[in-house]
Design a protein with these regions (language model features):
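Amphipathic alpha-helical protein-interaction segments enriched in hydrophobic
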Residues: 176-187
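Polar, glycine-rich mid-to-C-terminal structural blocks
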Residues: 190, 196-199
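Conserved, well-structured interaction surfaces
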Residues: 9, 13, 17-27, 49-123, ...
C-alpha cells in the first residue's frame, strides 16, 4: 500500500523497476502499440495471416470488440497507474537525495504523458486518472484537456530528467537506459506536431 511504501531507496528503485516492467509489457508484440501509426500499410498484417484484429486496423474498420485495441487500452492505464503511484508518493521517501526523487518522479511524469498521448491519438476523448485507483466511471475529458495534461507532464520531465545518466541502472557505458532530457524533447516535438495537425 502507498501509505507504507517508499520507506527507503530500495522502495523507490523498485517502484521504477515496476513502472518500466509495465512499460515493457505494453510495448511487447502481443499488444497493438502501433495502432495509430501502422494502419493502412502492409507491415502489420496480410490476407493469409491469422491476425484479424490487426487486419481491421489496416482496413480502417475496427470493431468495438477488437481484442488488440482493448489490450492497448488496458496496458496504457496500467502504465498510468504505476506512474501515478510514484508521482503521488515518492516525494516522502526518507534518506534519499531530492535529486534522486525528482528524477524518479520526472520519469513517471514522462511515461504518464506518453501513455496519454497514445490514448488521445487513438481514441480522442479519454478519462484522466491522477490517482493510483482506476475509476471506471470517470468522465471522458476533451482532447484539449488531455493534451494540457500531456504537456504539463512533459515539461516537468524536461526540467528534471538529466541529459545523461552516469550511474546504473539508468545509464550504462555512456548510454541512457532511462528517459533522458533528449527523449522528452523529442516526444514533446512530436506532440506539438500532432496538435498542429502535422503528424
Amino acid at each position: 500500500p502507498s501509505d507504507t511504501y517508499f520507506s527507503n531507496k530500495e522502495d523507490l528503485d523498485a517502484s521504477l523497476t515496476a513502472l518500466y516492467s509495465v512499460i515493457a509489457s505494453s510495448q511487447a508484440s502481443n499488444n497493438l502499440c502501433g495502432t495509430n501509426f501502422l494502419v493502412g500499410d502492409d507491415i502489420s498484417t496480410h490476407p493469409s495471416s491469422n491476425k484479424q484484429p490487426l487486419r481491421e486496423h489496416d482496413q480502417f474498420d475496427v470493431k468495438d470488440n477488437n481484442s488488440w485495441l482493448s489490450s492497448m487500452w488496458e496496458q496504457r492505464f496500467k502504465v498510468i497507474k504505476a506512474a501515478n503511484f510514484i508521482i503521488n508518493n515518492a516525494e516522502r521517501t526518507p534518506e534519499v537525495s531530492k535529486d534522486d526523487i525528482k528524477v524518479a518522479i520526472a520519469q513517471a511524469h514522462y511515461w504518464r504523458a506518453y501513455s496519454y498521448f497514445y490514448l488521445v491519438t487513438t481514441w480522442g476523448r479519454v478519462p484522466i486518472m491522477l490517482k493510483e485507483e482506476i475509476d471506471y466511471n470517470a468522465p471522458l475529458k476533451t482532447e484539449e484537456e488531455v493534451y494540457e495534461l500531456i504537456l504539463s507532464d512533459l515539461k516537468i520531465a524536461e526540467t528534471d530528467c538529466p541529459a545523461l545518466y552516469t550511474k546504473e541502472p539508468y545509464g550504462r557505458n555512456g548510454m541512457n537506459i532511462a528517459v533522458s532530457e533528449g527523449a522528452v524533447k523529442a516526444t514533446m516535438a512530436y506532440v506539438y506536431m500532432c496538435m498542429a495537425g502535422w503528424a
